[in-house]
From Swiss-Prot:
A GO CC term assigned to this protein in UniProt: cytosolic small ribosomal subunit
Organism lineage string: Bacteria, Pseudomonadati, Pseudomonadota, Gammaproteobacteria, Pasteurellales
The name this protein goes by in its record: Small ribosomal subunit protein uS17
Subunit text: Part of the 30S ribosomal subunit.
Pfam family, one: Ribosomal_S17
Organism (species): Haemophilus ducreyi (strain 35000HP / ATCC 700724)
Length: 84
């Protein structure tokens, strides 16, 4: 059985923790009755072994085994650095 490793992109909204940060992932959902597209945000805690990601960066993350109670994703790469 081959499992596809799920990767997503998001924006770093907090990097105050050691070896971890919080990513906000935005998606659009169509309202069931009115049909208007609404933005929904999901926040995930991500493991960052080398503290590479900084506030405002766009990063690519993937699912992994649970690292702690809230962290079950890890950093793959920094896609775009934040403008300083």
């Amino acid at each position: 059985m081959t499992d596809k490793i799920r990767t997503v992109q998001g924006k770093v909204v907090s990097d105050k923790m050691d070896k971890s940060f919080v990513v906000a992932i935005e998606r659009t959902v169509k309202h069931p009755l009115y049909g208007k597209f609404i933005r929904r945000t999901t926040k995930l805690h991500v493991h960052d072994e080398n503290n590479e990601a900084k506030l405002g960066d766009v990063v690519e993350i993937q699912e992994c085994r649970p690292v702690s109670k809230t962290k079950s994703h890890k950093l793959v790469r920094v896609v775009e650095k934040a403008v300083a």
